[in-house]
Each structure stands twice: as C-alpha cells, then as structure tokens.
A protein has these predicted regions:
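A broad, low-specificity signal marking well-ordered, structured residues that form hydrophobic/aromatic
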Residues: 27, 44, 164
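Beta-strand-connecting loop/turn residues
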Residues: 3, 54, 143-145
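Extracytoplasmic soluble-region selector
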Residues: 1-36
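Short domain-boundary/entry signatures in modular proteins, especially
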Residues: 31-41, 127-136
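Short, conserved sequence motifs used for protein processing/export or organelle targeting and
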Residues: 66, 72-182
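Short loop/turn segments at connectors of secondary-structure elements within structured domains
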Residues: 23-25, 40, 158-162
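Local sequence-structure signature of Cys/Sec-based thiol-disulfide redox active-site neighborhoods
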Residues: 35-75
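Extracytoplasmic/periplasmic beta-strand context in beta-sandwich domains
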Residues: 3, 27, 47, 77-79, ...
C-alpha cells in the first residue's frame, strides 16, 4: 500500500501500481540476499533540464559531450520541458528541484552544474571517481515492444533514506534545436 515498497524478507512479490483511474499490469519482483562486492565503482548522473526551443541549452549538451570524452562513468538524461518530448515525469522532476530557468543541469541531484558547464567538466567527472559503499547494476532485455529489467542493489553499510530511481530512455530522437551559441 502507498507509493513505496519495502521488502522485509527474501522472496517473490507481485506488485502493481495505480493512479486513479489507471492500474498497471502486475509484475513480479524477486528479492534475494547475496554477498555484495567489498566496494563499488562510483558513477554520476547529469540531469539536463532542456527543450528544443531553448537557444542556450546546446551549451549543456556540449558540456555533456566533453564529460563523455573524459569518462564512461557519467551518464546523462534530458528532462524536456515545453516540447514534444515533455512528459509528466520531466515536469515532476522540474517541480521537485525548483527548476525555473533553462538550461539547468544537476550533477547527482546534489548540485547545479556550474555555469558555463563546458568550463566546469571536472565538477561532473570528479563525482564519478573512487569507490562507493552502495552499488547498482541494471540488465535489460528487449523483446519486441516489451523491456525486461533486472535491477540489483548492493550495500556494504547501513544506509537510511535511500531511493531507487529508474529511467527508461529513448535515444537517437532527431529534432530541430534552437541554438544561440553558433
């Protein structure tokens, strides 16, 4: 019940989500207890609040490409606002983080990526160095129009208040982009 699920034991759990009047299909979640590695490789995420109408937003995209040239441990996601790629999740994130201007990018949800982003690549890269005591792995299988995910977490310490956010992204969308920088 409620908007979260906490497994208190190992086993299989049948769950579904509902938001009146919609109800999802039921899925099965397997919870198992395995030994975690002694350390996990740190990763980072850049959440880019953007839109095709935003003429200054290519600056952040360029910054992301510079980060990707330096490391494969930083991932990015575009949360589109005000264009055909906008969805309710992008709006929920925008509202939760109080985004009012574009572009805005967050690194690991803990800090706004400093302007000008292409000159502050180290801010993102440095968040993805070293080891962590919490880890995550995701495997996926695409079968026609159905995607199956295997999500595993590992904890080498007790951590409270953790949340797991999973994005399923579509890549390679071609659209016209306003650009005031070139």
């Amino acid at each position: 019940n409620g908007s979260s699920f906490l497994a208190e034991s190992v086993g299989s759990f049948n769950i579904k989500a509902s938001l009146t009047p919609q109800i999802s299909n039921e899925i099965i979640i397997q919870v198992s207890n395995v030994d975690a590695p002694s350390a996990f490789t740190k990763k980072a995420i850049i959440e880019d609040y953007t839109g095709t109408w935003c003429g200054w937003c290519p600056r952040v995209s360029y910054g992301i490409s510079l980060v990707e040239e330096q490391t494969d441990k930083v991932f990015s996601v575009g949360a589109h606002i005000g264009d055909f790629m906008e969805n309710s999740y992008s709006n929920s994130l925008k509202d939760a983080f109080g985004v009012t201007g574009y572009p805005t990018a967050y690194v690991n949800r803990s800090a706004v990526w400093a302007y000008p982003e292409p000159n502050n690549v180290a801010q993102a890269v440095n968040q993805a160095t070293g080891v962590a005591n919490v880890g995550l792995s995701v495997g996926s299988i695409l079968d026609g129009s159905t995607i199956k995910l295997l999500v595993s977490t590992g904890f080498n310490e007790n951590v409270s208040g953790t949340k797991l956010v999973i994005f399923i992204l579509e890549d390679g969308i071609i659209a016209s982009q306003s650009n005031y920088t070139s």
